[in-house]
C-alpha cells in the first residue's frame, strides 16, 4: 500500500501535467517566461571573482580562484579552465554528502562546455611563460537551493563571476592585477518538453513531470556553443529547431537584462 506522501506526490504531478497540457503553468507563467532573476556580484571576499544568482527560489553561488600551474602539453600557450559543481545537501533533501553525483558532473560539463566552446575567456592571455607557467581558472559552482533549472542559474552565475574576476598578478610579482580577459557572454537556456509543449525555465515541480529537457548554450552572435539533452523522451526534428529558436530568442533577452544587472551590481 502506498504511503500518503506518495499519493499526494502523484496527485500533484498529475495536476501539474494536466495544467501544462492545457497550456497553463502552476505558477501562472507563460511557456516563454522565466521566473524572477536576481544577480549579486563580489559576494565572496577571498575569491578573485564571485556571483550569486537567484532564479525563482533556486539559488546558486559561484566563486572563481586563480593559481599558477603548468599548461597542457598540447596547448602550451593557453591557460587552463576547471569547472566543478557541488549539489550541497542544504539545497535539497535529495542531495547527500559524499562523492559528486553523476547529475552534478553532467551539469558541470554543460557549464564548462558553454564557457570553452563559446570562447568566453581569452585563454591565451592566461599564459605567463609558454610551456612553463599559465593561470589555472577554477570555477566552483555551489547550489544553495534547488527549485528547478539549476543549469541555467549556474551558467549565469559562472559568467557573472568570471566577468568580475581580477587576475592576481601582484601576488605573483607579475605587475598590477587586471580584469580577466573575457571575449563572450554565453547564456544557457533549458527547455522542458511535456506532451507536445515546450517551455523555458522549468521549476522543480515541472522537472518532475517533464519527459525531457534540452539545454542550449549560445553566444551573442546566435551561434550554439553547446547542447545537452536529459531524459529518455525523443525530440522530433521540428521540436529541436523550435527549441533552438526559442533558446536563442530568450538568450538574447536574458543577455541584455543580465548586462544591465551587472552594471547595477558593480
UniProtKB/Swiss-Prot annotation:
CDD domains on file: RNase_PH_archRRP42 (cd11365)
Entries under SUPFAM superfamilies matching the protein: Ribonuclease PH domain 2-like, Ribosomal protein S5 domain 2-like
Principal subcellular localization: cytoplasm
Family to which the UniProt record says this protein belongs: Belongs to the RNase PH family. Rrp42 subfamily.
Functional note: Non-catalytic component of the exosome, which is a complex involved in RNA degradation. Contributes to the structuring of the Rrp41 active site.
HAMAP family assigned to the protein according to its UniProt record, in alphabetical order: Exosome_Rrp42
Keywords assigned by UniProt, alphabetized: Cytoplasm, Exosome
Localization in the cell: Cytoplasm
InterPro entries with a match to the protein in the record: ExoRNase_PH_dom1 (IPR001247), ExoRNase_PH_dom2 (IPR015847), ExoRNase_PH_dom2_sf (IPR036345), Exosome_comp_Rrp42_subfam (IPR050590), PNPase/RNase_PH_dom_sf (IPR027408), Ribosomal_Su5_D2-typ_SF (IPR020568), Rrp42_archaea (IPR020869)
The keyword Cytoplasm belongs to this UniProt entry's keyword annotation: yes
The protein's assembly and partners: Component of the archaeal exosome complex. Forms a hexameric ring-like arrangement composed of 3 Rrp41-Rrp42 heterodimers. The hexameric ring associates with a trimer of Rrp4 and/or Csl4 subunits.
One Gene Ontology biological process: rRNA catabolic process
Any GO molecular function: mRNA 3'-UTR AU-rich region binding
Protein name: Exosome complex component Rrp42
GO CC aspect terms: cytoplasmic exosome (RNase complex)
Domain of life the protein comes from: Archaea
Cross-referenced Pfam families: RNase_PH, RNase_PH_C
